[in-house]
Amino acid sequence: MIAKHVPMRSLGKSDFAGLANYITDAQSKDHRLGHVQATNCEAGSIQDAITEVLATQHTNTRAKGDKTYHLIVSFRAGEQPSADTLRAIEERICVGLGYGEHQRISAVHNDTDNLHIHIAINKIHPTRHTMHEPYYPHRALAELCTALERDYGLERDNHEPRKRGAEGRAADMERHAGVESLVGWIKRECLDEIKGAQSWQELHQVMRDNGMELRVRANGLVFEAGDGTMVKASTVARDLSKPSLEARLGPFEASPERQAQTTAKRQYRKDPIRLRVNTVELYAKYKAEQQSLTTARAQALERARHRKDRLIEAAKRSNRLRRATIKVVGEGRANKKLLYAQASKALRSEIQAINKQFQQERTALYAEHSRRTWADWLKKEAQHGGADALAALRAREAAQGLKGNTIRGEGQAKPGHAPAVDNITKKGTIIFRAGMSAVRDDGDRLQVSREATREGLQEALRLAMQRYGNRITVNGTVEFKAQMIRAAVDSQLPITFTDPALESRRQALLNKENTHERTERPEHRGRTGRGAGGPGQRPAADQHATGAAAVARAGDGRPAAGRGDRADAGLHAATVHRKPDVGRLGRKPPPQSQHRLRALSELGVVRIAGGSEVLLPRDVPRHVEQQGTQPDHALRRGISRPGTGVGQTPPGVAAADKYIAEREAKRLKGFDIPKHSRYTAGDGALTFQGTRTIEGQALALLKRGDEVMVMPIDQATARRLTRIAVGRDAVSITAKGSIKTSKGRSR
């Protein structure tokens, strides 16, 4: 793991609210945002916590430095610590830096190849109102990371900084922007030539041959490229500092001002870092787009502005017509005055809506036509379906492939419907949405998120088969392999595991499932049609079995022939509606539990026993011999009727139905009330709309589209939901039925 402080270069741009809003913004991605929490804040929501932090910062008027501390904690690719581990790591790091009592907002991000935590810390103490600045934070963070890796079993990183200052920033630029820095170019192209110079004249000639110039700047030396980019000589190598060179070559000698113009053998340009694929055409397209960016943005803004002006003019024209109509048909001075006021208010509202729409369009245009680095441009092209851009991202040195719990396919691919793409990282990893889970694809293997559901695992198997082939290789923990075997059996996909042990286990479970289904399905045994080769008949060996054996095979204490065509009538229904809790093969239920109709709900059935069913086996209890009218309480599904507790509606469902009926009745009368219904799982985002209490039962209101879903909850959940902002916070329902906010909180 790596913990890094991100300083704000310009003090005037320091803004805790902007930082907190950025780290808690989902950016229209389902799997970008993980757990979000506010620590040492009294507020119940993130926006209120931001206001509380800003108020605390305003109490300190003497501090001149940055009052916000931005910290990033990143983990190795493939590491997925649990939520409790992440919270413990955050707490220990903040305490180690001296910010244990300070207000902070943190968010877990999953939209890159490395799981990471953003922590926005208020440097102003909430009670003392003094500003705290950590002492040697890089050293403290390195020691904390080493201890945390040891305590939580994380993969070890080297926390000794190998690059400092400008050299480290140049390396960051190459990694994140994908553009070659001057420091990196010198090291790769001409560092040996520079170190091999034996005099100042020879050193100046080497500089000219490589399109650079050696100059004195302040108390040191700098290398200046032809485009004006400069770097300190000591940043390139410690033995190229001015004292080191003077000790080796003597006192510094400047280059003669007049030199014959020589053609440089090579020259530094801000070109992309060399990749394993050819990116000449892509980079030419990138440069052309960046050069025409300003013109294209101005043209798009002009079109949007003309469209806004036309809409405003149309609104004013409509308003003038309305006022003219009022002038002609209006009766009475007071009535006309009221109508004129309504017309003016409607015009102002319409113009405000038009201006708001224009502001949104302008923001989107600036975002679309903003200048991007080479790596960001490749990412945008890949998101729009550019296969060459995606291949270039995957060819970068930073792209090292997925690790941890992964699956890969081999063989003949079977293209099919692919799930929606949530994001593409700068390493070329595609993040797919699979229900509540995320599936990552790096072009070679797939990785499933830690909180993957059974549906997510099945979707990963289906995706691997469609994109790579039906021979599946599973790598990871024993638990993950067991989950993939279970998902393969449940999905019934035509795949094969390359690991013989996994494949044998899958075959065993599959055979067990098929055997279990055959025992649940009624056998087709009619009185007629038992000729050779007839459908549903038994093997010849079974036809010569004894009567006792035939009764045992029937499994219900009756001869197989006595079942007659009643088995034929129920064959199709039993195939569609599988009966639950069926015993093992050969086990017969007690007589009082026979003839149940589990596939039918809440139906009173009277059955007249056939002649073949009057004789009972001797092991039947005596109270069954003289059968009279028996109550139907033994039916597996309860019967709703007065005086019995079986089949009663649960209180939560009854309260929800009552509330829905009351709201629907008002809606049908013309009230402006959205449609209400019980909560059902489905696609679409849910927005929290508040809670209600009906007959002592708490209900949660969740809005999906234009419909309000009503869900029964307990009192503890209702109390916790009071901290969620009504109408603003998005929520989701977990597989266990609990409410989870988009910020990661489970209710």
UniProtKB/Swiss-Prot annotation:
The keyword Ribosomal protein does not apply. Residues 510-594, 624-652 are annotated as: Disordered. Keywords: Conjugation, Plasmid. Residues 537-562 have a biased composition (Low complexity). InterPro entries: Endonuclease_MobA/VirD2, LPD7, TraI-like_C, TraI/MobA_relaxases, TraI_M. The keyword Lyase does not apply. Residues 513-526 have a biased composition (Basic and acidic residues). Pfam families: LPD7, Relaxase, TraI-like_C, TraI_middle. The initiation process of transfer DNA synthesis requires the interaction of at least three plasmid-specific components (TraH, TraI, and TraJ) at the transfer origin resulting in the assembly of a specialized nucleoprotein complex - the relaxosome. Site and strand specific cleavage at the transfer origin is dependent on TraI and TraJ. NCBIfam families: TraI_MobP_relax. This is Protein TraI. The gene is traI.
